[in-house]
Amino acid sequence: MKILITGVHGFVGSNLVKALSEEHTIYGLDIVSPVKDGVRYTFSWDYLDKEDGIPEVDAIIHLAGKAHDTKNKTVSDVYFKVNTGLTQKIYDYFLTSKTAKKFIFFSTAKAAADKVDGILTEDVVPSPVGPYGESKIAAEKYIQEHLVDDKQVYILRPCMIHGPGNKGNLNLLYGVVKKGIPWPLGAFENRRTFTSIENLNFVIEGLLTKDVPTGIYNMGDDEALSTNELIEEICKSLGKKAHIWKLPKGLMTGIAKIGGALHLPLDSERLRKLTENYISSNAKIKKALGVEKMPVDARTGLEATLKSFK
């Protein structure tokens, strides 16, 4: 199978190339186009407008996008220009392709909901908060408004993706624990769904090779983990004893309010993000792929990621 991957030089793109390149021919589409092992050739975006600019492919995986800026420094228009605009451009190209029959769009769980009561399923009425989620849901809507019968389209809503070499939020938390700083939020009981890169690769391979119905699919590991469990796993990987303090919730909430006024590292929003529940169901994608469980459990995937931080 010939596959075009946008954002091929990013973390997820690089891992998909490793997972798919032995059995498939991979082409890239990115803002930079250096030589990359496993990729036949990487094109720049202007090649979409050229006649015979990009070879005909069988499937397109659209990863390119503006990631969520947790510091809120990105102008909202940038999110819509990239996350919505580029999606429209590559999807229009897909619709005109004579050979491409499968399109996989990486949206985000945040397009569905910023907060989750209970378990998040694909049936939820989307209520994104902020330009990141809003730009992703706008891209989803455009795709859904332009579906065609002879092509299969998959909109994926993954929870936080991690894996070896990923320098994201887990790496930041790892750095805090490595310094020996006690975790003061042990009194908060929460559970969150994560997406191990091995499970992501498994899902993509299945969507490419199996006859899966067009639709929206949540993506995540089978097991949800608490922040306290994350701290324990990080300490385990470092060979350290976990120092988890169960300080009163009211005290920590008050400190967070003061922190917001004084621009300290812990404010009310960050406290919410660190202690809220965000559980997403992956039952629909497993049923579509004909499997009962993901190949890698959440803890095993986390261990592999943490090991790479050393």
Question: What do the PLM-derived regions correspond to, one by one?
Answer:
Residues 44-85, 89, 93, 111:
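NAD(P)H-binding glycine-rich loop region in Rossmannoid oxidoreductase-like domains
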Residues 89-131, 154:
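Conserved Rossmann-fold NAD(P)-dependent oxidoreductase catalytic core, especially the SDR/UDP-sugar
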Residues 197, 232, 255-292:
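Conserved C-terminal active-site "lid" loop/helix of NAD(P)H-dependent oxidoreductases
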Residues 210-266, 302-306, 310:
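Mid/C-terminal beta-alpha module of Rossmann-like enzyme folds, strongest
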Residues 284, 292-310:
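Amphipathic terminal alpha-helices
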